[in-house]
C-alpha cells in the first residue's frame, strides 16, 4: 500500500519573537458544543479548528461515512494514531450505532470537525502497481479537541485521561450513510441542535419493544 503522510505544517505555540501562535491566527475558527456530564447537566466546550483547504467536492455531515487520512497528536505533538496507507480501513462511520456502541463511531470532536470539511471532487485513483493514490483536492483541517469532546476521563492506549487532542485530517470521500437501509439518509433521521446535542427520534416507541431510533429502524421512514 502507498504511504500517506499529513504534511501540512502548523505552528502550535510561539517559539520565537517572529513566530506567531496559531491561536492568534485570524483564520482560526471555533465551534461551541454541549456535552452531558455525569450529573446529566449540559457543559459547553469549545472546538477550535483551522481549515487549511476547504475541499472541492461534497459537503459532510456528522452522520456520514467518510474516507480520511489523519494524524492524531497530544499537546506535546507526540503521535498516538495515524493512517499510513490507503485501504478500506480508512472508511469511518462517524456516528456509529448508539444501541450497540459500535466501535466505528467516533468521538464528538472528531465527528464535528470532519463535518466542517468538503471531500475531494476526484476521489482515489489506482497506481500502476495496484496501490491507491489519494487526491490532493480534499478538505484539510486541524482540530483542537478538548478532553470533554474526546475521551475525557477514559484513558486509551497512548492517550492519558483528560487529554486534549489535535487531529490533522484530509477528507478524501464522504457517503450519506443509511444505517438501516430504508432509503432515507441517517442525517435526516436524527435531530442535532445548534450546540451539537443529538436526539434520536423513535417513530414506533409506543408500538414495539425494539427500542431502536429511527436511523437504525427500517420500519421508520
Segments the model singles out, each with a brief description of its role:
Residues 1-221:
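Cross-family detector of peptidyl-prolyl cis-trans isomerase
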Amino acid at each position: 500500500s502507498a504511504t500517506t503522510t499529513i504534511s501540512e505544517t502548523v505552528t502550535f505555540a510561539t517559539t520565537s519573537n517572529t513566530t506567531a501562535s496559531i491561536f492568534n491566527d485570524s483564520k482560526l475558527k471555533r465551534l461551541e458544543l454541549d456535552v452531558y456530564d455525569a450529573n446529566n447537566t449540559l457543559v459547553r466546550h469549545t472546538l477550535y479548528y483551522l481549515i487549511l483547504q476547504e475541499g472541492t467536492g461534497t459537503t459532510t455531515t456528522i452522520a456520514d461515512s467518510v474516507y480520511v487520512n489523519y494524524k492524531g497528536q497530544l499537546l506535546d505533538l507526540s503521535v498516538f494514531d495515524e493512517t499510513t496507507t490507503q485501504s478500506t480501513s480508512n472508511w469511518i462511520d462517524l456516528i456509529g450505532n448508539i444501541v450497540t456502541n459500535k466501535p466505528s463511531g467516533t468521538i464528538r470532536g472528531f465527528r464535528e470537525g470532519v463535518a466542517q470539511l468538503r471531500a475531494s471532487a476526484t476521489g482515489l485513483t489506482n497506481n500502476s502497481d495496484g496501490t491507491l493514490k489519494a487526491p490532493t483536492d480534499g478538505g484539510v483541517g486541524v482540530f483542537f479537541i478538548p478532553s470533554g469532546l474526546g475521551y475525557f476521563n477514559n484513558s486509551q492506549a497512548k492517550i492519558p485521561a483528560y487529554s486534549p487532542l489535535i487531529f490533522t485530517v484530509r477528507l478524501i470521500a464522504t457517503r450519506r450513510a443509511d444505517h438501516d437501509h430504508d432509503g432515507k439518509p441517517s442525517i435526516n433521521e436524527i435531530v442535532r441542535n445548534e450546540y451539537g446535542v443529538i436526539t434520536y427520534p423513535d417513530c414506533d416507541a409506543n408500538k414495539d419493544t425494539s427500542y431502536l431510533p429511527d436511523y437504525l429502524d427500517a420500519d421508520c421512514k
